[in-house]
C-alpha cells in the first residue's frame, strides 16, 4: 500500500499549559502548515485566583501579603501600587527617607526581574550559559532583600506611609558594592550575547511591532519603548522621588525581539545609576509616617469594660477609604501596572481593578507569530516577558 509523500491538511498542536517555555501555565493552540504558523490562540485563566474579589473583602494591610503573588518575580512593584493607591486617595504624605528607600528597593527588584527574564529567554533560544550566570547576580540582590526585609521573595515590606523597617547597619555599603560589581556583569552579558551571530539570527527582525501598533494595542514598558515610543512613567508621570535623579529612558526604534532585549539590558544599567544616586543622597529622618498609625484611632476602652479588647499584639492601622475613586500607576519591569480604586467610606475597597502589563502585552502574540516559523514562537513569547500570576490574577 502506497502512502502519500505529503499531506495538505493543517496540523493543530497544543503548547502548554505544562510546557517549560510557556513561562507559567499558558496554553497555546497553534495551527501549523508544516513549520509555518497559520494561527495561534492563547488560552488563559489556569492561574486565576480572584485577586480583585479578595481585595473587596480585606483591608489594605490585610491584602498586602496577597499582592506579592501577582508578579512573583517583581513583588516590590505590586506592594508599591497597593500602598500608593490609598496614600493618594487619602492624601497621606510619606517621609523623604522612606521614599528613597522605596526607590532603591524598586530598582533592585527591576534588575532582579530583568535578570530572570534574560536567563530563561536565552535558554529558550538554546543558550544555557547565561541562564546560570544571571543567578549569580540575582542571588546578591536577594541577599540585600533578605537583610532589609527578612524575606528573599514575597517581601511584604511596603506600608501605608512608608516602609516596615529602616535599612540595617552596613546595608548601604553592601548595596554600593553590588552596584560596582553588577556593572561589570552587564558588560560580560553583552560580550557573551549581544554580538553573538547565532543569537542575532534568532532575534533580528523577529516579532516586529511598529510604534503605531504598540500604541493601538495599549502596550507598555519595554514592549512600547522598543518600538520607538519614549514613554516611561518614571519620567512622564513621576512618583516617589524619581524626579530627583539623573537617568535616561532606554528605547530602540527597530521594534523587534533584539530591540526589546537591548531596552531591558539598558534599563538594568540605568537602574544601577538610580540606585547609586539614591544611596548616596538618602536623607535621615523617619522611615514611616507615624501619624498614619493614629489615623481615626479608636478610643481606649476602660479595663474590664464591655468594649474592652484583649490584644496579643499591636494591631495594624486601619482607616476608612473615603467615597471617591482614582487610578494609580507605576512603571513595573513589564510595563504599566495600575490600580483603579473606588472607596465607599468603609474599611474595604468597593472596587479594586488591576491593570496588569503582562495581560495586555500578551494580546498581541497571535498577530506576531502568524506567518512565522514554529521555533520563532519561543523567541517572540520570551521577548514579551510574561508572568502568568499577573496575567490571570
Swiss-Prot record:
The keyword Chloroplast applies. SUPFAM superfamilies: HydB/Nqo4-like. It catalyses: a plastoquinone + NADH + (n+1) H(+)(in) = a plastoquinol + NAD(+) + n H(+)(out); a plastoquinone + NADPH + (n+1) H(+)(in) = a plastoquinol + NADP(+) + n H(+)(out). One of its GO terms (molecular function) is quinone binding. It is found in: Plastid, Chloroplast thylakoid membrane. It comes from the Eukaryota. Keywords: Chloroplast, Membrane, NAD, NADP, Plastid, Plastoquinone, Quinone, Thylakoid, Translocase, Transport. Gene3D superfamilies: Cytochrome-c3 Hydrogenase, chain B. InterPro entries: NADH_Q_OxRdtase_suD, NADH_UbQ_OxRdtase_49kDa_CS, NDH1_su_D/H, NiFe-Hase_large. GO terms for cellular component: chloroplast thylakoid membrane. Pfam families: Complex1_49kDa (PF00346). PROSITE patterns: COMPLEX1_49K (PS00535). Its EC number is 7.1.1.-. It is an enzyme of class 7 (translocase). Its main location: plastid. It is a peripheral membrane protein. GO terms for biological process: photosynthesis, light reaction. NDH is composed of at least 16 different subunits, 5 of which are encoded in the nucleus. NCBIfam families: PRK06075.1, PRK07415.1. Belongs to the complex I 49 kDa subunit family. NDH shuttles electrons from NAD(P)H:plastoquinone, via FMN and iron-sulfur (Fe-S) centers, to quinones in the photosynthetic chain and possibly in a chloroplast respiratory chain. The immediate electron acceptor for the enzyme in this species is believed to be plastoquinone. Couples the redox reaction to proton translocation, and thus conserves the redox energy in a proton gradient. PANTHER family: NADH DEHYDROGENASE [UBIQUINONE] IRON-SULFUR PROTEIN 2, MITOCHONDRIAL (PTHR11993:SF10), NADH-UBIQUINONE OXIDOREDUCTASE 49 KDA SUBUNIT (PTHR11993). This is NAD(P)H-quinone oxidoreductase subunit H, chloroplastic. It comes from Triticum aestivum. The lineage of its organism: Eukaryota, Viridiplantae, Streptophyta, Embryophyta, Tracheophyta. The gene is ndhH.
